[in-house]
Regions:
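Conserved beta-strand/short-helix segments
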Residues: 1-430
C-alpha cells in the first residue's frame, strides 16, 4: 500500500442536498478499483423515489438516501442520488451499502423495513434491479448490514433481531433475477446475541463471516465452549462456507482475551480469498498499545481492539492482536481489509491522549480540542507481521464528527474512504 497516495488523493465529499442531521457518511463502500464510491445518509428526509429525484421535498423524515460518486478525468463527481422506489418515513435507507468489484452493482440495506435493494449501473445510469424481501416481521433489523460478492451475484443480508437471536440471509442472482439460497443461524443462537449486525463475504461469495457482538459465551479462541454464557456481550464471530450451493458453519471464533461487554464482532472483514479475517471489538478493555501487547482486560474505558485470523485449509488460527498506538476509545468500530489482506483500516471513535491531529499522520497539525472527532488507523502486513503505518483524520477535524464510523478500502488498499456522519459543514458536493 502506498500510504503517500492517501495524502495526494484526499477529497472532501458532501451530499448534493446537505441538510442538518442527515448523517451523510453513515455507511460507505468503494468499488475494487476505487473509482466508484457509495455513501449512505440514513436520516435524509426527501420524499423522492428512485434515481435522481427531487432532493428538496423533505416530507419523508429519516427515509434515507444513497449518493454515488465516480472518478472522472475531471476528478470526483456525484453520479447519482438514489432513493428507494417505495420511499417511506423512518426506513433509514442507506444503513449499509456494498458495491461489486466493478462498481456496477450496488446493494443497499435499511434499518427498519424488511427490505434490501439492488441497483445496477449501465454506463453512468443507475436503475433499481430488485427489492430483496425477507419473510420476517418488521423491526428485525433486516438490512442493517449487506455484503455483495465481487461479481455482484451473491448477496448476504444481516438481520440481527431475527427470531430474537439474529440471522444472515444469502441471495443469489441469475441474470437480473434474485432468489434466496440460504438462511444462516449461529450454532449457539441465543436471545439478543445480535448475530448479523456485521457480516462480510469473500470475493467469490463462498465464505461468509458474521459477527454477533452481544453473544455471551465465556469461551476464548477457536471452536470453544459455546454454552457457558457468563461473559455478557463478549461477542463472537462465525465463519460459514458454501459448497455446491449448500452452506455450513466452519468456525466459531472468540477473542483470545474474552471480556465482559467487549462486543467482539461489532465489525468484520474478510480478504478476497476468505483466508484472512479481521474482527473488531470496539469495547475491549486492555491497556495495551500497538501489536500483540498484553491482553489482560483491565477496564481501560472501552479502548477497543482488532483481531486477525488466518485460515489454512479449513482450520483457523489467530495471527495478531492489534491495538492503536495511543489511548483511544472505540477502536474497531469499523474495519476494512484490502483484497490481499496486507492493508487494514480501523476506525476509532475518540482519541483520549490529547494527541489528535488533522490530515494524514498529523500533516494538518495538532487539534487538542477535537478529542472525539474520530480517527482511522492504517496497518500493513508483511508475511504475517503487522505494523501501524499511519493514521488518518479529517482535514477539518472537529469535536463529535465521528470520523471513522465507517471505512472502506479499494481492492489494492491504495484508496481509502472514511465517513464522518456528524460533520457539521453546510457545504454541498465535492
Amino acid at each position: 500500500s502506498d500510504i503517500d497516495n492517501f495524502t495526494n488523493a484526499i477529497g472532501y465529499f458532501k451530499a448534493s442536498n446537505t441538510e442538518a442531521n442527515d448523517s451523510f457518511g453513515y455507511s460507505v463502500s468503494l468499488s475494487g478499483d476505487g473509482m466508484t464510491m457509495a455513501v449512505g445518509a440514513i436520516h435524509e428526509d426527501s420524499s423522492a423515489t428512485g434515481i435522481s429525484g427531487n432532493q428538496s421535498d423533505n416530507n419523508s423524515s429519516d427515509s434515507g438516501a444513497v449518493y454515488v460518486f465516480s472518478m472522472t478525468d475531471a476528478g470526483w463527481v456525484q453520479q447519482s442520488y438514489i432513493k428507494a422506489s417505495n420511499t417511506t418515513t423512518n426506513h433509514r435507507f442507506g444503513t449499509s451499502v456494498s458495491l461489486s468489484d466493478d462498481g456496477n452493482t450496488l446493494a443497499v440495506g435499511t434499518l427498519v423495513s424488511t427490505k434490501a435493494y439492488v441497483f445496477s449501473r449501465t454506463g453512468s445510469t443507475w436503475s433499481e434491479q430488485a427489492i430483496i424481501e425477507s419473510n420476517i416481521a418488521p423491526f428485525q433489523g433486516f438490512g442493517i448490514r449487506v455484503s455483495i460478492s465481487s461479481n455482484g451475484n451473491t448477496l448476504a443480508v444481516g438481520s440481527p433481531l431475527d427470531s430474537g437471536t439474529g440471522a444472515a440471509y444469502i441471495f443469489v442472482r441469475s441474470g437480473s433475477n434474485w432468489s434466496q439460497q440460504a438462511y444462516i443461524k449461529a450454532s449457539n443462537a441465543d436471545a439478543q446475541d445480535s448475530f448479523g449486525t456485521a457480516l462480510h463475504l469473500s470475493s467469490d461469495g463462498n465464505t461468509l463471516a458474521v459477527g454477533a457482538f452481544q453473544e455471551d459465551s465465556s469461551a476464548s479462541g477457536i471452536n470453544g465452549d459455546q454454552v457457558n454464557n457468563s461473559k455478557g456481550s463478549s461477542g463472537a464471530a462465525y465463519v460459514s462456507t458454501r459448497n455446491s450451493n449448500t452452506w455450513s458453519q466452519q468456525a466459531y471464533i472468540k477473542a483470545s482475551n474474552t471480556g465482559l461487554l467487549a462486543t467482539f464482532g461489532r465489525s468484520i472483514s474478510l480478504s478476497a480469498n476468505g483466508d484472512t479475517l479481521v474482527v473488531g471489538s470496539d469495547r475491549e478493555g486492555s491497556t495495551a498499545l500497538g501489536i500483540d501487547g498484553g491482553q489482560t482486560t483491565s477496564g481501560s474505558n472501552f479502548s477497543g481492539a482488532t483481531y486477525v485470523y488466518s485460515r489454512t485449509g479449513s482450520t483457523w488460527s489467530q495471527q495478531a492482536y492489534i491495538k492503536a498506538d495511543r489511548a483511544v476509545q472505540g477502536f474497531g468500530i469499523s474495519i476494512d481489509l484490502s483484497d490481499d489482506a496486507n492493508t487494514l483500516i480501523v476506525g476509532t471513535e475518540a482519541v483520549l491522549s490529547g494527541l489528535n491531529y488533522s490530515g494524514v499522520s498529523g500533516s494538518g497539525g495538532f487539534n487538542g480540542s477535537a478529542v472525539r472527532a474520530g480517527i482511522a488507523f492504517v496497518f500493513t502486513r508483511n508475511n504475517s507481521s503487522w505494523i501501524q503505518e499511519s493514521f488518518v483524520n479529517a482535514s477539518n477535524a472537529e469535536e463529535g464528527d465521528y470520523f471513522g464510523g465507517s471505512v472502506a478500502l479499494s481492492a489494492d488498499g491504495n484508496t481509502l474512504a472514511v465517513g464522518a456522519r456528524l460533520e457539521d459543514s453546510a457545504a454541498t458536493g465535492v
